[in-house]
């Protein structure tokens, strides 16, 4: 019996590991344009702020597609669905690597965004399902760790590959790694029937839960603020702080490394007081943005700010996702799809706001505007915390 139990634990952890790798590759490709923005803009003879709208387009496809695509695929067996999503993901990256103009690149990114829409709608509930019985919360933390490693390894490595070869090679390598993950998924994942996915009828039911709706609005607000600044952090560091490209790469690495600390803090502290944890994480996201320009030329201070910012955004993202799952246990996939959609509305809006700020005010102001949006989100958190204190 002990051997059987050990085998179960081993395979369950390996399956969680596959999902963590999947999160790594999806998050790497979503945000790697941030690390390659200047190179992509230069190759197409465009401005960084204009190319940055590619981030907005990607995010808005995800935000608009998450719920309807999840509902359309609600009855499909989950392993088969995941393999299809990875096939689409890989083919789209081949097109990205071959893109002969910006519009072809944009179209290829839309294919990736469609895969992303469904992947993040179903993954949180699936990783909890395949996890060992007493490791459900830790499994969600490992999923977030995969996302954090995308920032630690994916973005810096993507930037290094882009600098040594070119940005097209970065997308090609991502497609290659995704192929290996797809093979692991095919080999290790069990048959996963759709379960508690919810239906279209679940949507109005969820929308009648005011705290859940409040959390979705909070996600849009705080993520909009975050991505107003983060979408253009690479050109800010190079042009405003005037640090070298190597320092810029190292700062992206530090941001991702901080995400591991954020995942750890979530696992240790969230259950003790979820409301205070979310508020503290938001403060860590907001303050570095507001102070970014103030300390723009102090290298060690910028490193510290980026580290704290990375801790904040990672722990905040996991905490908000966990809160959504807690508030909607009867329709986890629908709730996750709306969460993913809300998150990507924030990404798209933030990248758009950042582009507008750069064109109207200047690159140096992105931190002030992003931080101000974060402060509005903090006030909203305070309001819903008081309003729904017993929920």
Curated annotation (Swiss-Prot):
It comes from the Bacteria. Keywords: Cell inner membrane, Cell membrane, Membrane, Sugar transport, Transmembrane, Transmembrane helix, Transport. PROSITE patterns: MFS (PS50850). The chain crosses the membrane at residues 16-36, 51-71, 82-102, 103-123, 138-158, 170-190, 210-230, 247-267, 277-297, 300-320, 338-358, 361-381. InterPro entries: MFS, MFS_dom, MFS_Efflux_Transporters, MFS_trans_sf, Sugar_effux_transptr_put. It is a multi-pass membrane protein. One of its GO terms (cellular component) is plasma membrane. It is found in: Cell inner membrane. GO terms for molecular function: carbohydrate transmembrane transporter activity. It holds the Pfam family MFS_1. Its main location: membrane. Involved in the efflux of sugars. The physiological role may be the reduction of the intracellular concentration of toxic sugars or sugar metabolites. NCBIfam families: PRK03545.1. Belongs to the major facilitator superfamily. SotB (TC 2.A.1.2) family. This is Probable sugar efflux transporter. It comes from Helicobacter pylori (strain P12). The gene is sotB.
